[in-house]
Amino acid sequence: MDLRPELPTASSASQVHPGAAAAAAAASIPVSMAGNLLRGPPLLLRAADKYPRTPKCARCRNHGVVSALKGHKRYCRWKDCMCAKCTLIAERQRVMAAQVALRRQQAQEESEARELQLLYGTAEGPAIAAANGIIPPRPNYEVFGSVSSESNSADSSIQKYELFPKNQLSGSATPQPSAGKPASTEGDSAPGISSPDGRHGGSGSENGDSESFISSPVSKPLKDGEETPGSVSSIGSDSGSETDKDDQEPSPSSAASRHMNAIDILTRVFPSHKRSVLELVLQGCGKDVVQAIEQILNNSGAQGPNKAGPDETWTAERMLQNAQQLPAASATTTAPTRPMLPGAMTLSNRSAFSPLQPNAPHFGADPSTYPLGTHLGLNPLRLAYSAHSRGLAFMTPYSTTGLMPTLGFRPPMYYAFSDLIRDRTMLHKEQGYASGLYGPLVNNTPEKQ
């Protein structure tokens, strides 16, 4: 009976105050139980305590899917996605991989440098490591890199091609007077040759003009053949105007230095010949060293070993001695020499920039002058100073119309070697082909008909 009135009062109280009933129920729950509800399951807590957070796929996370990264790279659905977020992730991964590789390399180099410091000491370790290539040199600003490389290459080329030292060149530039020949008469005989050499040799030795000694002896004949107008006029005197020749002429200092170097080369190659003779030969050849050497070799080869000494091999030297009016006692040998060539007189009288005439009377017709037969008219001066092409002289035995009908050669009398071809064609036909085409050349004596 007593319970009945209490129940409706309790129910009425709950209906009247529902918020108070909820607060009373929450107050009756223990605190430990509330903590367990907020903490989560104990299985996940143990995994989080033992292991770190497992990495997740960033591409999947961009698209709202959570997937572990381990073994997932090949099977990711968005591995080829090209959206903005995935492209940014790929670029970030590339940069991170490059940074990791760089740090790994730097750590390896530092460890090797420490080992070398322990082995060789603190001061010598980095230097030896850099020399061995273990530690590459730090990249610096190459502001003067190209200039230094050009200077180094220029220095190496100077060391490679400077075969003649400066002191020897300056010493040999001043002509030494011989015993039987005073220096004053030599300067009077060739004033245009010896005086510029002496002046330039002195200035080169005092001022250190490196420009006159840099050029190599090997490339010097090419430069002389290209730049000097003497060689151009010797090949074709009609080609080019006077203004072109003036433009092609180098400065006097460079021309004098080139001439001095050419004279020094000739004096080194032929020490037995006198300097004045070599200067005359070089002037006659248009300052071409190659032609001068060929002339000296041809003329010295034409003379036997028992005929005369080295001082009497050149007729130009005898001309120089006659011009200086030296006594006959200065001659070293008394053996008879070759007669003076009329063409040799033109070496000093004519200019170096005008070609020598290739006519036969200018070169003499003595059969003992040259080893080649006079019926061909082949001599070194003629081949070297022809106004036309030099290759024509070696084709003249074949340049008749009967042997080469297809080539458009003009008749022989139009060439500068017309007398050469006429002499060859005037030979008896049986004489020319019975003993061979070059039989008279080998025997050095024309056959008797």
Curated annotation (Swiss-Prot):
Residues 260-295 form the DMA domain. This is Doublesex- and mab-3-related transcription factor A2. Residues 167-177 have a biased composition (Polar residues). InterPro entries: DM_DNA-bd (IPR001275), DM_DNA-bd_sf (IPR036407), DMA (IPR005173), DMRT (IPR026607), DMRT5_1_DMB_dom (IPR046472), UBA-like_sf (IPR009060). Residues 57-104 bind DNA. Its main location: nucleus. The keyword Endoplasmic reticulum does not apply. Residues 166-259 are annotated as: Disordered. Keywords: DNA-binding, Metal-binding, Nucleus, Zinc. It comes from Oreochromis niloticus (Nile tilapia). PANTHER family: DOUBLESEX AND MAB-3 RELATED TRANSCRIPTION FACTOR DMRT, DOUBLESEX- AND MAB-3-RELATED TRANSCRIPTION FACTOR A2. May be involved in sexual development. GO terms for biological process: germ cell development; sex differentiation. It is found in: Nucleus. Residues 230-240 have a biased composition (Low complexity). GO terms for molecular function: DNA-binding transcription factor activity, RNA polymerase II-specific; metal ion binding; RNA polymerase II cis-regulatory region sequence-specific DNA binding. Belongs to the DMRT family. The keyword Endoplasmic reticulum does not apply. It comes from the Eukaryota. GO terms for cellular component: nucleus.
